[in-house]
Amino acid sequence: MELKIDTHSHTYASGHAYSTLIENARSAKENGLAMFCTTDHAESMPGAPHYWFFANQRVLPRFLEGVAILRGVEANILNTEGEIDLPLSVDPNLDWAIASFHEPVFAPSNKEAHTQALLNVIQGGRIDALGHLGNPHFDFDFHAVLHCAKDHNVAIEINNSTLKGHSRVGSVERCYEIARVGKALGVYFTTGSDAHFCQDVGKLDLASELLDSVGIDSHRVITHSPSQFLDFLELRGRGPIDELASLRQ
């Protein structure tokens, strides 16, 4: 499946990534993307940037190296109440918010606790996608969470980095099963490289392979085309981004 948007990438501001936003944009162009989301870790992750880093993203240009930039964050799920580590005042300055579990922030617990946290973060209405759900340390009720995501128009991320099998070991088959459940329920899918170095931005080959293998319809993959992605943002209640209107053509 052709994928024109990468919705998960990091700069050196995350504390354990190694490239600048401009370097990421250059790689995005080289790898054939139309747009990408910059999604550094929110502040609870060790080494992550502070409040003003996210609040000030309005100064970022809408295009770098001819590639559209979406202003975003990878927020941490903090607890079973589904709270995230991002002040509400930041939300108007961002286009895209992922919520993810990370061991340094949310200690792995049990299936029921993880499920409750995911249901609550979806129902909270502040996040657009759930990141790298395949991690076996954070087992959850696939059907309950994906059904909730479908009802609230929250996308399910297919994470290319996870599918390499080097991080979040044990995730690959779980990612395929999550995709199968999501297909049956009719969820929206997004795709992210989870790049921590610029050369990986736009590397979505394994995500594309999974989507094709499971038989996901491209109309349910919001990263298949810029127009689909922008339509999804508006479905989520975000206002139109006038500077990106030309990408709908």
From Swiss-Prot:
Highest taxon, organism lineage: Bacteria
User: Which residues are listed for Zn(2+) 2 binding in this entry?
Assistant: H16, H41, H196
Cofactor comment = Binds 3 Zn(2+) ions per subunit.
Alphabetized UniProt keyword annotations: Hydrolase, Metal-binding, Zinc
Where on this chain does Zn(2+) 1 bind? H8, H10, E74, D194
Database matches in SUPFAM superfamilies = PHP domain-like
Listed under GO biological process in this entry are: bacterial-type flagellum-dependent swarming motility
UniProt-recorded Gene Ontology molecular function terms: phosphatase activity; zinc ion binding
**Family as reported in the entry's similarity comment:** Belongs to the PHP family.
Q: Which protein, by its recorded name, is this?
A: Probable phosphatase VV2_1469
